[in-house]
A protein has these predicted regions:
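Single conserved hydrophobic/aromatic residue that forms the stacking wall/gate
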Residues: 1-12
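Non-cysteine beta-strand/loop elements that form the S-adenosyl-L-methionine
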Residues: 16-19, 47-52, 155-164
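Divalent metal-binding pocket/active-site signature
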Residues: 23-31, 37-127, 147-148, 152, ...
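Thr-Gly-centered strand-to-loop micro-motif
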Residues: 86, 111, 132-135, 160-161, ...
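His/Asp/Glu-enriched short active-site or ligand-binding loop at hydrolase and phosphoryl-transfer sites
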Residues: 128-140
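Conserved catalytic/ligand-binding micro-motifs in nucleotide and anionic cofactor chemistry
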Residues: 143
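Mid-to-C-terminal alpha-helical segments outside catalytic/metal-binding sites
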Residues: 179-214
Length: 214
């Protein structure tokens, strides 16, 4: 059946988006700061810039194009005063160097689907960054990552699905979906030695604080 206008409004009331060019697409979708700002400003429901960053694992785009695109996104996020969502793979030093370049310009950073080292986490915390955990933290071979999230303060942690990828244990191998988020949340609660309810409250508050939503 068709939804009423009010029902449609209710469905999207608490839904938000971000705008950016993934590093895989940096070659074929070049974009500058002003274009990013224009697209983000089209809709008040767009609350961040990204996912952007550097991926030197797949190298679907050349490094120069990735770095140029990343820096344009950084500049746009600063001018818009909105968080930038970072994808970083096999590019820890380069990612930090670019972000650190703008540390005195009130840049707001979210390290998306964080799987980086403890050393990078420490440096990113000096930039007042947030870190988002995906289902990867539930995997058997993620002991080091679990230790890293144990070190990261709870008030700097968010939880994500990365759907349709990275379904958490016990749903690993299946197409990921939002309903599986609870497994990642429960695992993070164990890492932090608090209840899932407390973890849910903390991560929700962190999201609202970072993205300035009620």
């Amino acid at each position: 059946h068709q939804l009423t206008r009010r029902q449609r409004q209710m469905c999207i009331r608490d839904r938000y988006g971000t705008f950016g060019i993934h590093p895989h697409e940096a070659n074929t979708n070049s974009i500058n700061k002003d274009q990013i700002i224009k697209n983000v400003s089209k809709n008040h429901k767009i609350i961040g810039v990204g996912e952007t960053g550097l991926d030197f694992y797949y190298n679907n785009s050349d490094k120069v194009s990735q770095i140029n695109s990343f820096e344009e996104h950084i500049l746009a996020s600063i001018e818009l005063n909105k968080p930038i969502i970072i994808h970083s793979r096999n590019a820890e030093d380069e990612t930090f160097e670019l972000l650190n370049k703008y540390k005195n310009q009130n840049i707001k950073i979210l390290m998306h689907c964080y799987t980086g080292s403890l050393e990078l986490a420490k440096k990113m915390l000096d930039l007042n960054s947030y870190f988002s955990a995906s289902g990867i933290i539930t995997f058997k071979k993620s002991a080091d990552l679990n230790n890293t999230f144990n070190f990261i303060p709870s008030d700097k942690i968010l939880i994500e699905t990365d759907s349709p990828f990275l379904a958490p244990v016990p749903k690993r191998g299946k197409t990921n979906e939002p309903s599986y988020l609870k497994y990642t949340l429960e695992h993070m609660a164990k890492i932090k030695n608090i209840s899932p309810q407390e973890m849910e409250l903390i991560t929700s508050q962190n999201f609202k604080k970072l993205f300035k939503v009620n």
